[in-house]
Amino acid sequence: MLNGRAVDTSRRPLRKIKLSLMGPAFIAAIAYIDPGNFATNIQAGATFGYTLLWVVVWANVMAMLVQLLSAKLGIATGKNLAEHIRDRFPRPVVWAYWVQAEIIVMATDLAEFIGAAIGFKLLFGVTLLQGAVLTGIATFLILMLQNRGQKPLELVIGGLLLFVAAAYIVELIFSQPDIAALGRGMLIPNLPDGNAVFLAAGVLGATIMPHVIYLHSALTQTGGEESKTERYASTKFDVAIAMTIAGFVNLAMMATAAAAFHFNGYENIAEIEEAYITLQPLLGNAAATVFGLSLIAAGLSSTVVGTLAGQVVMQGFVRFYIPMWVRRIVTMLPSFIVILAGMDATQILVMSQVLLSFGIALALVPLLVFTGNKELMGELVDTKTTQILGKLVVLIVVGLNAYLLISLL
């Protein structure tokens, strides 16, 4: 599907093979720190302080499992999740799957694209429309790297992930959170009221992203001369590092919002622009600037990942291909329509996260069916424990997202 890479392993130790294969999980991990996460984590931290940090911890653990299963499917079978669904499900079901997956990808891209545009607006004082134009140009330039193969794209997106992580280390230094209270928030589950449950569902819904479940299996489905066991060992290392970084960023987002807003009496911060403006007098212009830069980096990289995921679902489900630049133009249109119509940008981010909740179970259930199939997976088939944990994740995700949807209706 996407470009693989050949690596001569005859004279190389496993440690070096692991390092050469690192990358796909860094592309997937970007989806876990997109602008939707910014909005949700800021609101949760401002409203409840450190209380909901434990939700981020467990959501990230669940996301690690999901991404590892997705990557393993590609390694074991040489096919991605969309292709397996196409080959094993009735044709009408496949077409329905494709349509919902495309809607999910476009909803995701809408949030990510508008998030980056907001970042440009805040940082450079341009209009939201001008920010959208800058976002479009920047994403085209990043996507051009795909012509050089998968590795350059992995390096750039991985670099942006590390930049966002570094930015939030700076934000934590500026905000000076209470370390003891932060630790308690991470370790002690607590949902003080119905609004906390609502925000917890939002955090989980913004964390596990259906489009990268499809994408990750495509990023790992081709390889060089390494054995499947070697590739899977490398992938576990890749997923652990990338998702730990993404988890740290989400924790830092919420902790910064708690320290800067909640404990300074600003408990009703619900919009990204409001958070930026409020940061300036509280922590200084430097902190606000770092926040804006991290929002741009997260938005640009995640919208690129969304475009790649769109290619995977179209080619995988219906064997149809369109040039990347055409897809980028088509998926930008809803963002420009929203901006030109004067809709509330942050509200659109929240609505897009709700729409995503419809696609999570639709991706997770067949993924578990396939990775638990001995005939299909061979020696990489899931253990009984893995299958139980996977089904538990499905139940939690579906339950909390159902609560989120019912609460919003």
From Swiss-Prot:
Membrane topology recorded in Swiss-Prot or TrEMBL: Multi-pass membrane protein
Principal cellular location given in the protein's record: membrane
Listed InterPro entries: NRAMP_fam (IPR001046)
GO cellular component, one term: plasma membrane
Domain of life, per lineage: Bacteria
Transport found in the keyword field: yes
Keyword entries, A-Z: Cell inner membrane, Cell membrane, Ion transport, Membrane, Symport, Transmembrane, Transmembrane helix, Transport
Alphabetized GO MF terms: cadmium ion transmembrane transporter activity; manganese ion transmembrane transporter activity; metal ion binding; symporter activity
Subcellular location as annotated: Cell inner membrane
Membrane-crossing segments per the record: 19-39, 46-66, 98-118, 122-142, 155-175, 196-216, 241-261, 290-310, 320-340, 348-368, 388-408
GO biological process terms held by the UniProt record: cellular response to iron ion; iron ion transmembrane transport; manganese ion transport
PANTHER family with a match to the protein in the record: NATURAL RESISTANCE-ASSOCIATED MACROPHAGE PROTEIN 2, SOLUTE CARRIER PROTEIN FAMILY 11 MEMBER
NCBIfam families: nramp, Nramp_1, PRK00701.1
Record function comment: H(+)-stimulated, divalent metal cation uptake system.
Family membership noted in the UniProt record: Belongs to the NRAMP family.
Protein name per UniProt: Divalent metal cation transporter MntH
This protein's encoding gene: mntH
